[in-house]
Design a protein with these regions (language model features):
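Sequence-specific DNA-binding modules of eukaryotic transcription factors
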Residues: 1-144
Length: 144
């Protein structure tokens, strides 16, 4: 039984994927419930191959897996932002922990959060634009 290696994305490819997702949002490929219309992965694969002709990224599994991971991170950070004692600093992409006890309680609720503790999330503002159901950004809740 062989194990496949996960594909490592370079930063330029991630930026291109974000750009492609934003273009889909702007061109009515996003449904009111926050999901994308059928065929969006193929559109993104085409976009990636135009911008990075030799990248070899395919809709399945590469693009789908990347977006699924981003959505998990987005949901966890969004939930953390809504909790007292926690927040997000957009300027450097870090999760703020004003109250360590609040963080300990949070990682009991969202087990995925524990692996996100000391990482930076520079694409979070883009994810808000892409994954938020109403498409609005939440600049008023920004903490610095």
């Amino acid at each position: 039984m062989s194990q496949k290696m996960a594909r490592v994305w370079i930063q330029e490819e991630e930026f291109t994927l974000v750009d492609g997702l934003k273009k889909l949002c702007a061109n009515d490929w996003k449904e009111d419930n926050g999901t994308f219309k059928h065929g969006y992965l193929m559109k993104l694969e085409q976009h990636m191959n135009v911008c990075h002709p030799n990248c070899g990224l395919q809709a399945l599994p590469h693009i789908f897996s990347k977006i699924r991971g981003w959505k998990k991170h987005f949901m966890t950070i969004s939930l953390a932002k809504s909790r007292s004692g926690l927040g997000f600093r957009y300027i450097d992409g870090t999760i703020l922990v004003d109250d360590p006890e609040a963080w300990d309680d949070f990682i009991k609720v969202d087990l995925y959060a524990k692996s996100m503790t000391f990482k930076k999330w520079p694409l979070f503002a883009d994810w808000e634009e892409i994954f938020r159901k109403d498409g609005a950004t939440e600049q008023s809740a920004e903490r610095t």
